[in-house]
Amino acid sequence: MLEKLAKKTYLGLGSNLGNKKKNIEIAKFLLQQNSKFRILKTSSFYKTKSYPNYKDPFFLNIVIEGETSLKPLDLFVFVKEIELKLGRKKTFKNAPRECDIDILDYDQ
């Protein structure tokens, strides 16, 4: 259950490998499994080119507005665990990935 002092946060979710939309939907589902994180709003899906490797597959992305009672470092660890569950491997910088979750903003 979220504590009364929950902080607003914005997460960017993206995928450029496999079934991109399904990867993002699974990541959203896994985020909601943590009782200390709640999704408030979700953007529409949008595409972006891979950077800096424009020849890599495009990214499908969303932005999530959420509330969390997790501290910033705990939130970071939590989203990295989700990336790993979805098959993300650190092969080289800016490599294509099944799931990428970035903390865009954390209300302190």
Regions found by a protein language model. Give the residues of each.
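Core catalytic alpha/beta fold that binds nucleotide/phospho-ligands
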Residues: M1-Q108
